[in-house]
């Protein structure tokens, strides 16, 4: 069971990530959410969105790169949140 401090840390991280996701363009955000939060495979995402698997991979790459840059801009790192992600 998580202690209250860990629960607060997880909520804060969730809030930060949700805010960062909103800064991505819709296409990148959609793919990142489907892959990372819903656990779909690239092939499944491609079928759902009716796009090629390579397009899904490209959007995922640029989406994750965008998230990294957004978090860096906000000075949020693995060390500042106490996790490895």
Label for each model-derived stretch:
Residues 25, 41, 50-55:
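Helix-turn-helix DNA-binding motif, specifically the short coil turn and the N-cap/start of the second
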Residues 31-35:
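A short pre-motif secondary-structure segment
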Residues 26, 36-37:
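Short, conserved catalytic or interaction motifs in soluble domains
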Residues 16, 47-50, 65-85:
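C-terminal edge and immediately downstream basic/flexible tail or linker adjoining helix-turn-helix-like DNA-binding
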Residues 1-19:
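Acidic, proline/glycine-rich intrinsically disordered inter-domain spacer in sigma factors
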Residues 11, 21-28:
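Short helix-coil-helix linker/hinge
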Residues 59-64:
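Residues within the DNA-recognition helix of helix-turn-helix
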